[in-house]
Amino acid sequence: MKKKILFISPTGTLDNGAEISIVNLMEYLVQTGHQVINAIPDYHVAVQQDYISSLAALAIETIALPSVKWWWEDAPGGLPGSPESRARSYQENTSALRKILTERKIDLVITNTVNMFQGAVAAACEDVPHFWLIHEFPDGEFGYYKEKLDFISDYSQKIFAVRGALQRQLQELLSNRKVLSFAPFTKIHPTNTGEKDRAERRIVSVGRLTERKNQLELVKAYNQLSQPKPALVFIGAWDEEYKKQCDTYISEHQVKNISFLGHKDNPWAEVTAADLAVFPSAMETFGLVYIEAIMNGLPTILSDNPGHLSAYEIFEEGQLYSSGNIEELADKINLALANFEGLKDQSVANLGKIQERYTVQSVYQTLLDKIENTEMYKANSLRHVKCLLDTNLPSQQASSFLRKVKNKLLSGRRG
């Protein structure tokens, strides 16, 4: 049975993996006959209009709701406005979502990322099944949601987490629930990287230069490589303060042959078949850039952070090193450079297997199965008091007794 599905999206932009992944899922659902509506916060920025137009071209309707803050109060993003204005905004957003559910006869609500709760509450009020897709580890900037897992459990018929380390961690924290899995998906069109014999060997790392991406670790390992060593190339924009840290280390240790290319619309067009890809991230939710590298047939070395491990468990391609162990990383790079031709041939030979494992259908199979079977879910008891969440109730005048008390107090002050 085909369904009307309402997605609650975190930003209404295509500059993050969670949004990119879910748009691909929404597109697939439309192609298979479902009707998809997408709710986003309206921040009145041009990039959101591009996002809305892109989704409209895929037959996905987007509804932008004015919002003081779309995410939980203690989620990243600060505290814009006053406590009263945020509370009112949450109420109005929840009310607007409830109206969409009833007027559009929505069959299922899916909240994409842990950071929004309005869709879960609206679904509970209107007796509509709700699925929650969690991309974030409950640590660091997203550690705030660990104490909200009871709410997440109470207001979700099904909970999904990125497969691997995150799924296992949440399963331990939600021992009374079955946490299901998915993997983020991005469309990858392998780039023609040219013949490997026509380009110089290089070490490349694609991605924004940030403390979390941890490229300084690669710079330090590069400084320890055996001579002669190939060029090290970073492709991606950067955070200014972190770039200064890298520049300072390079200058103080007189490290040569490192270049920073900055942002490129198609970073993989800068890569050649003679390149070795290295990703030293300290933390990732999922290793999308690692997947892009192996789907371009590049020999790859990656740190063993939980997000990388989650992706590695699917493909088992490339070489892992212990995050933070600079000596081990240097050894892995030296060995990979010495055996590059064999690693390259192996990477190219495995491309067919990798492409078969990474499709929308395969990474979202469990979710797709559950979407087809939402009829048996138990209603949430919040529906019995949903009138308390209405925002269109008329303001009540104070009773005559209360007015007399107020007047008495005021006259006492004047006396």
Kindly give the residue locations of the regions a language model identified.
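Nucleotide-activated donor-binding/catalytic signature segment of Leloir-type glycosyltransferases, i.e.
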Residues: 244-262
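Short hydrophobic beta-strand element within catalytic cores of glycosyltransferases
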Residues: 299-303
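A conserved mid-protein helix/loop that constitutes part of the nucleotide-sugar donor-binding site
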Residues: 19-24, 201-204, 208-224, 241, ...
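Glycosyltransferase donor-sugar binding loop
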Residues: 39-47, 206, 231-244, 260
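Conserved acidic donor-binding segment of nucleotide-sugar-dependent glycosyltransferases
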Residues: 315-327, 335-340
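Short glycine/serine-rich donor-binding loops of glycosyltransferases
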Residues: 267-268, 287-290, 308-309
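Donor nucleotide-sugar binding/catalytic pocket of nucleotide-sugar-dependent glycosyltransferases
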Residues: 63, 154-191
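Aromatic "clamp/platform" in nucleotide-sugar-dependent glycosyltransferases that forms part
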Residues: 263, 282
